[in-house]
Each structure stands twice: as structure tokens, then as C-alpha cells.
From Swiss-Prot:
This is Phosphonates import ATP-binding protein PhnC. Belongs to the ABC transporter superfamily. Phosphonates importer (TC 3.A.1.9.1) family. Its EC number is 7.3.2.2. ATP binds at G41, A42, S43, G44, S45, G46, K47, S48. The gene is phnC. It holds the Pfam family ABC_tran. Residues 264-287 are annotated as: Disordered. SUPFAM superfamilies: P-loop containing nucleoside triphosphate hydrolases. One of its GO terms (cellular component) is plasma membrane.
Length: 301
């Protein structure tokens, strides 16, 4: 069997909301296995919408388009495929809302990552095999919160909840992690720990990571490659190190202040806690430093 060349492949993806606003406009992307890529943009640029399409949570416009995950289509021409759940088994999700069930223990939340490979009766009864429980404790220890395994998820801080979500991705045996603003509202130390753990998943576990961020300096520190969105279009795809304030001004105009100011200030100083139980460019450059610098000329004036 041929090796999978792309972890994520997107062709001609567009999304128009019911109010007529174009949220995504002809997106074409290639992300190779093992890359750690930042997705940046001002508020309303389309970052979260793009991630939801990649995950198969939202269907695109009904026009020729495709999103593939590890060589398998997850949606085509505005329709999500029937096999979407099996494809999602390879994707770990980390969102701003933390996506944990507050009333359950931290360990049980992490074990949810194993449900897809368990018999139906174990799913219904919540009786997890000893091997899966051992795996969940090992994952919690790896992300640094093993001592909280028996606590209710509601008792964790925001940063700890994000790390629990990363532990769940390990138990799930995901191959791709989609992280939507995972350090929003976290204090600097919690933000560092979450980003360090994402990098560990990428380097040591060889997971492909696509993480949306507001803080350009965080993207430059952790992600070799950055994709920049503006008003639903890819305006930059290339080395993160090249994202100088001058280039951001060229790409975003006055909107660059949002990205530059947040980069200078860092995350908020107050770490939030979750109180809800419910869930919620142009052609990409190659990985591993072999970038084909891509600046959309339509946004370079």
C-alpha cells in the first residue's frame, strides 16, 4: 500500500452562511503527516469554521470541493460522507470549550477516547477494560495531571482541562489533532504547558497538529509553518519565522493590530474554568523546512 502523502487535503472549499456572508472562499490546502501548523487570523477570519469543516461537523457549499483525511474523503461537494464517524476516529479535538463532561471523572473523560474500539455493551455500561484504564492513567501522567484522575472534570482549571483533552487524544490513538484556540483565556504558564504538550504529541508521538491561534508569537515559537486567513481567504502560507510586524501589516492592514497586540501582550492573566457539560491560502507548502513561500498577491498591496 502506498504511503499517505497528506494528512489533510482540501480542494476548493467554500462556505456561505445564511446571511450571505462568505466565511470560507476557495480554500486549497495540503498538510503532510507529522507537521505542526498554526492557523492565524483576526476574529471572524474563518479559523474555527475551517476546522469544523475539516472535522466533518459542518458541510461546505454545494459546489465541487473535497476534504480528505489521511487519504479518505470526509466531505465532497457540500455533503459529509456516511463514513464520517469512522474517519473521525483518527482525529483528536481540542476546543476552547474544553469538551469535557463536568459531572464525570477526569479518567472517564479521557477513556471516552477509547469508546470507538470497544464492544457496544461496554459502551453502554461504561465498563472499560483494565488495559484501557491503564492507558488512560498513563496518558494523564504524560500530560502532567495524573493526580487528578479521580476528580470531577468540573474541578479542573482551564489549562488542566485542555491537557485532559490532549490525554483523551492519546487514548483515542488519534493521528491528527485539531486544536481551536486551545490557549484562549489561559494564563501564560497554563498556555505554555498546553502548547508544550501539543509539541510533544507532534514530535514524540508523531501526530499531525493543526492549531488555531490569535498570538503570532506563539505560532512562531511552536509551529514551523503558519497559514494565515483573512476574511475566509488564505493570504499567507509559509515559514512562521517570516511573520514580521511589517508582513502582518501588509497582509491584514489595520486588522494586524489584533494579532500584533495580542502577540505583545500574551494570553489573559486569568485562567478560565469550564461550566458547561455540552460540546460545543493558497496551496500549502511542504513540511520539514522545504517551504514554497506563498503570499497571495491579492493581499500584498
Amino acid at each position: 500500500m502506498d504511503a499517505i502523502r497528506e494528512a489533510i487535503r482540501i480542494e476548493r472549499l467554500s462556505k456561505t452562511f445564511s446571511n450571505g456572508r462568505k466565511a470560507l472562499d476557495e480554500i486549497d490546502l495540503r498538510i503532510e503527516p507529522g507537521e505542526m501548523v498554526a492557523l492565524i487570523g483576526a476574529s471572524g477570519s474563518g479559523k474555527s469554521t475551517l476546522l469544523r469543516h475539516i472535522a466533518g461537523f459542518t458541510a461546505s457549499d454545494a459546489q465541487p470541493s473535497q476534504i480528505e483525511i489521511l487519504g479518505r474523503p470526509i466531505q465532497q461537494n457540500g455533503r459529509i460522507v456516511r463514513e464520517v464517524r469512522s474517519i473521525r476516529r483518527d482525529i483528536g479535538f481540542v476546543f476552547q470549550q474544553f469538551n469535557l463532561v463536568n459531572r464525570l471523572s477526569v479518567e472517564t473523560n479521557v477513556l471516552i477516547g477509547a469508546l470507538a474500539r470497544l464492544p457496544w455493551w461496554r459502551r453502554l455500561s461504561g465498563r472499560f477494560p483494565r488495559a484501557e484504564r491503564a492507558l488512560s492513567i498513563a496518558a494523564l501522567n504524560e500530560v502532567g495531571i495524573g493526580e487528578h484522575a479521580r476528580e470531577r472534570a468540573a474541578n479542573l482549571s482551564g489549562g488542566q482541562q485542555q491537557r485532559a483533552a490532549l490525554a483523551r487524544a492519546l487514548v483515542q490513538r488519534a493521528r491528527i489533532v485539531l486544536a481551536d484556540e486551545p490557549i484562549a483565556s489561559l494564563d501564560p504558564e497554563s498556555s505554555r504547558r498546553v502548547m508544550d504538550m501539543l509539541r510533544t504529541l507532534n514530535i514524540e508521538h508523531r501526530l499531525t497538529v493543526l492549531v488555531s491561534l490569535h498570538q503570532v508569537e506563539i505560532a512562531m515559537q511552536y509551529c514551523p509553518r503558519t497559514i494565515a486567513l483573512r476574511r475566509g481567504k488564505v493570504v499567507y502560507d509559509g515559514p512562521s519565522a517570516a511573520l514580521t510586524p511589517a508582513l502582518l501589516k501588509t497582509l491584514y492592514g489595520d486588522e494586524a493590530r489584533e494579532l500584533i497586540d495580542e502577540a505583545a501582550q500574551g494570553p489573559d492573566d486569568t485562567e478560565s474554568k469550564n461550566t458547561a457539560d455540552n460540546t460545543p491560502l493558497q496551496d500549502a507548502a511542504p513540511a520539514s523546512g522545504r517551504y514554497a513561500f506563498a503570499l497571495n498577491p491579492a493581499h500584498s498591496n
